[in-house]
Amino acid sequence: MSLFRRDGRRQETMSLTAEHVSFRYDARRESAAEFALHDVSVAVQRGSLTGLLGPNGCGKTTLLRLMAGVLQPGQGSVTLNGRSLREIPRRELARQVAVVPQETHPAFDYTVLEMTLMGRHPHLGLMQLEGPDDIAIAHESLAATGTADLAHRAFATLSGGEKQRVVIASALAQSSSVLLLDEPTASLDLAYQLEVASLLSRLNRDRGVTMVLATHDLNLAAALCDSLVLLRAGRVIAQGPPRDVLTAPLVQQLYNVEADVRFHDAAGHLTVVPIRRAR
């Protein structure tokens, strides 16, 4: 059994869509101002890397939780390959959509291999994950994230960048076709940010993994993402390719930045995105 086809790409890919989704944490309140998300529509194309941008409290994490099926929308729907998440059994959904949290603090002193094995079947205990297929896929996931040589190290002893790569390996071990990543580089220094960014780019480009990335980092979003969704106060205020979204006046006002976005060739591929604070 293998996670990937012979050409290195995922066995299958999924499309994920939120349509006119609204959500509030306190459903008893009727005021529209209490909505964490209001009439949000986002289409994540299979094999793409979509970035969710916006300030704290704008709804990025809430949208990720809805896409993971952890929360259910009060209005609208979230679908995976045209099928409502409400109709997909929890265990089946967990095998198709994996969540990579901002930070991971395991309760016990697991090894890297054990952490990855637990990602293989999120609803089962570690002792049930000793089958040869599970172990082979765990090792394959570690190899895909460049952490195979860490398999027998204690997770707690790793650097921040190593931990994040192992958490991504654990998500890959679920055999999921969609990864939802919540601020994957937020707590890392620059060297580890670049390390994780390079890994995500490689998994998306070479392995065909569909990703949705919530981040505050405009440079990360510009460098990695095919499309960006900008949220403010629970509403989508801009979305599209990075060259359109990052140069929009709304973005520059919201982040207090000036973005000099340069592209080359007719396809408009990104080459340089220096983003600096506006004076």
Region spans (language model):
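Conserved structural motif at the start of ABC-family nucleotide-binding domains
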Residues: 16, 35-37
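Conserved ABC ATPase signature
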Residues: 154-158, 162
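Helix-to-loop junction immediately C-terminal to a conserved catalytic motif
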Residues: 68
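Catalytic Walker B motif of ABC-type/P-loop ATPase nucleotide-binding domains
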Residues: 179-183
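The feature captures the beta-strand-to-loop junction immediately N-terminal to the Walker
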Residues: 53-55
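Conserved ABC ATPase "signature" region
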Residues: 117, 132-150
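Conserved ABC transporter NBD signature motif
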Residues: 76-84, 93
